[in-house]
Design a protein with these regions (language model features):
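Active-site gating/metal-coordination segments in enzymes
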Residues: 52-53, 61-145, 150-151, 194, ...
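Alpha-helical scaffolding within the catalytic cores
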Residues: 37-42, 67-74, 97-101, 157-161, ...
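Mid-to-C-terminal alpha-helical segments outside catalytic/metal-binding sites
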Residues: 1-9, 13-53, 223-226, 235-272
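Active-site environment of divalent metal-dependent phosphoester hydrolases
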Residues: 11-14, 61-64, 92-95, 121, ...
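Conserved, mostly hydrophobic/aromatic
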Residues: 7, 46, 73, 106, ...
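Catalytic pocket-lining loop regions of alpha/beta-barrel enzymes
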Residues: 112-113, 123-228
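Well-formed, non-transmembrane alpha-helical positions, independent of function
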Residues: 45-48, 105, 163, 191, ...
């Protein structure tokens, strides 16, 4: 069985512990993370779990971090072919810097998507300063992956993802955490499940709830070819998240697609 982890974070060793702890505290983890967000640790965990590839990223919390993070991710992906690199962007960078040049650099260096995390970046997912970025991405077959949902603040909910995805219908958008982290309400999520350019990952979802039934209903509401496995490393352990996914009772053909084939087809920039 082949597996791609479509949702992992990595950090330079000197800040990895601090970044991981801050993230875990923000999201009220039901159990403390056992990992630290360091490159070698992720490589070791992937090997132990039998996971072939991991998409890696880190969100820029200021405009000044954008280029540094993108080059860091590029460097680590060059060194480790197991890594699928994904860049980042910030609304302040989009407003003040030459974002088109940065997106071109990303594409030329194998970073075909960008990750945003509005809660930590202090702008909303549908911030109109980001619309020129989304337009440029749409023109150049880049994809967006965004943290989606937080019941405590309204900066990345499914209604904001819906606005972006409908404004840019050829921009492929990955809504993380089944589309609305911490508020898995079908009524709120259903509108994005009906959009052809919406994809979703299952990271940081099933591990937060005892009753898996409502989340399984949400999973089955999405296009079955648009669902990806993701662990949210280092918040969760890829090996344990894979084991939990295998125990959900997902139909074998769909399970194989979620674990590997769907993302392999989505990520057409290189053979996986």
């Amino acid at each position: 069985m082949r597996v791609i982890d479509a949702h992992t974070h990595i950090f330079p060793d000197k800040i990895a512990d601090k970044a991981t702890i801050a993230t875990a505290e923000y999201f009220d983890m039901p159990e403390p993370p056992n990992h630290h967000g360091k490159v070698q640790e992720l490589l070791d965990v992937l090997a132990e779990a039998g996971i072939e590839y991991a998409m890696v990223f880190s969100a820029a919390t200021s405009e000044h971090q954008v280029e540094h993070i993108n080059r860091y991710i590029f460097k680590e992906a060059q060194a480790h072919p197991q890594f699928i690199p994904c860049g980042t962007m910030h609304a302040d960078y989009a407003a003040n810097q030459d974002f088109k040049a940065e997106l071109a650099w990303m594409r030329q260096n194998g970073l075909h998507g960008l990750k945003i995390h509005p809660e930590f970046q202090h702008f909303v997912l549908d911030d109109e300063r980001m619309f020129p970025v989304y337009e440029e991405m749409e023109k150049n077959d880049m994809f967006l992956i965004s943290h989606t949902g937080d019941p405590r603040v309204n900066v990345s909910g499914p209604e904001r993802m819906y606005r972006v995805a409908t404004a840019f219908p050829r921009l492929r958008c990955i809504a993380t955490h089944l589309g609305n982290w911490g508020d898995w309400d079908m009524g709120k999520i259903r509108p994005i499940t009906e959009l052809p350019n919406i994809y979703v990952d299952i990271s940081s979802s099933f591990s937060y709830v005892e009753d898996k039934g409502p989340l399984m209903d949400i999973l089955h509401a999405y296009d079955p070819k648009h669902i990806f496995f993701g662990s949210d490393y280092p918040i969760w352990c890829p090996k344990k998240e894979l084991e939990k996914t295998l125990r959900l009772g997902i139909e074998p053909g769909l399970l194989e697609d979620i674990l590997f084939h769907n993302f392999a087809a989505f990520y057409h920039y290189r053979a996986l």
